[in-house]
Swiss-Prot record:
It holds the Pfam family RuBisCO_large_N. Signal peptide: none annotated. The disulfide bond which can form in the large chain dimeric partners within the hexadecamer appears to be associated with oxidative stress and protein turnover. Belongs to the RuBisCO large chain family. Type I subfamily. Keywords: Calvin cycle, Carbon dioxide fixation, Chloroplast, Disulfide bond, Lyase, Magnesium, Metal-binding, Monooxygenase, Oxidoreductase, Photorespiration, Photosynthesis, Plastid. The keyword Magnesium applies. It is found in: Plastid, Chloroplast. One of its GO terms (molecular function) is ribulose-bisphosphate carboxylase activity. This is Ribulose bisphosphate carboxylase large chain. GO terms for biological process: photorespiration; reductive pentose-phosphate cycle. The active site is at K152, H271. Its EC number is 4.1.1.39. It comes from Blechnopsis orientalis.
């Protein structure tokens, strides 16, 4: 399984693993073990190996390089033949590549840093239900980032008071408000009541401002059937967008919801709840850029992507690297930004990155510079924490955004 002379094919799925072998285990042996366990291998030779062509189907560790400044840590590059994976299934992709190998005895730690998804495979996925340009056309909003707000307190409000907070924020000038990721259907606020009061707030704020407004109605539920029932009700109410927690809900549920949203004209906002369990450790788990690529294939029009300047962790260059992987068609390899492979998405629509977490109006100049126009800037406490209330907080955000955009556009002539 360690084949340094292997020439990768355009159709191979390529993976970059950061691996820390156990003391005494050679890097080549560890790399071969990763390639074997994540493809056709097992712990011993079996007689049924002779009934198939392992050369055709096995993963190959084709390169290993030491990590600068780290003792006994290596980047192992593995190539997988396309036929190992079911078309259009992120679930199967991850089950194969990361499903079992992370508990391997020969390794102290293992982290999947990046994947190269070839067009031959990415074209089998639904991708974002609509994409950036279609969303702008639906909302009739151009030339600036979109503004959002997560309603706080995240838990405990009644449906009517929740709807009131939504109305005040949208009336003040925001484009979107949002259910928190853990707002589903709890005893203090059942989902149907919340949807009804939020719909009333949407229509009232639209009538008063003349702008199209949205609220991310969280359709995440305990079963796929219940999730789709909530999405259907949101569409019947005339809501433009629903939301899903894609890691806790699962990729199968997420792709099912993405198909429904595309077929029924709903935008799909994605929250990454639970991501830090997977991506926080620097030497074990999976980098968020891999989860971001998986989401773009599984389906979503927005996804939370860190802020660089807020309360949550995020390095500027690395964050901008996976923001480009979400938005752009073609992204060149750039190790300084953590991009291990050139990625060609061909015609797959882009995903709007959402900056959210501990940001407020004083961050607006930095946010508009870092994320550009094709983004959603989402302020929770940065809106609702305004000393004069929710609506003035929304006004402050909108004024700050428009001032920054005007300063950028007109520069010294302002």
């Amino acid at each position: 399984y360690y084949t340094p002379d292997y020439k990768t094919k355009d159709t191979d799925i390529l993976a970059a693993f950061r691996m820390t072998p156990q003391p005494g285990v050679p890097a080549e042996e560890a790399g071969a073990a990763v390639a074997a366990e994540s493809s056709t291998g097992t712990w011993t030779t079996v007689w049924t190996d002779g009934l198939t062509s392992l050369d055709r189907y096995k993963g190959r560790c084709y390169d290993i390089e030491p990590v600068a400044g780290e003792e006994n840590q290596y980047i192992a590059y593995v190539a997988y033949p396309l036929d190992l994976f079911e078309e259009g299934s992120v679930t199967n992709l991850f089950t194969s590549i990361v499903g079992n190998v992370f508990g391997f005895k020969a390794l102290r730690a293992l982290r999947l840093e990046d994947l190269r998804i070839p067009p031959a495979y990415s074209k089998t996925f639904i991708g974002p239900p609509h994409g950036i340009q279609v969303e702008r056309d639906k909302l009739n909003k151009y030339g600036r980032p979109l503004l959002g707000c997560t309603i706080k307190p995240k838990l405990g409000l009644s449906a009517k008071n929740y709807g009131r907070a939504v109305y005040e924020c949208l009336r003040g000038g925001l484009d979107f408000t949002k259910d928190d990721e853990n707002v589903n259907s709890q005893p203090f606020m059942r989902w149907r009541d919340r949807f009804l009061f939020v719909a009333e707030a949407l229509f009232k704020s639209q009538a008063e401002t003349g702008e199209i407004k949205g609220h991310y109605l969280n359709a995440t539920a305990g079963t796929c059937e219940e999730m789709l029932k909530r999405a259907v009700f949101a569409r019947e109410l005339g809501a433009p967008i629903v939301m899903h927690d894609y890691l806790t809900g699962g990729f199968t549920a997420n792709t099912s919801l993405a198909f429904y949203c595309r077929d029924n004209g709903l935008l799909l906002h994605i929250h990454r709840a639970m991501h830090a369990v997977i991506d926080r450790q620097r030497n074990h788990g999976m980098h968020f850029r891999v989860l971001a690529k998986a989401l773009r294939m599984s389906g979503g029009d927005h996804i939370h992507a860190g802020t660089v300047v807020g309360k949550l962790e995020g390095e500027r260059e690395v964050t901008l690297g996976f923001v480009d992987l979400l938005r752009d068609d073609y992204i060149e390899k750039d190790r300084c930004r953590g991009i291990y492979f050139t990625q060609d998405w061909v015609s797959m629509p882009g995903v709007l990155p959402v900056a959210s977490g501990g940001i407020h109006v004083w961050h607006m100049p930095a946010l508009t510079e870092i994320f550009g126009d094709d983004s959603v800037l989402q302020f929770g406490g940065g809106t609702l924490g305004h000393p004069w209330g929710n609506a003035p907080g929304a006004v402050a955000n909108r004024v700050a955004l428009e001032a920054c955009v005007q300063a950028r556009n007109e520069g010294p002539n302002l």
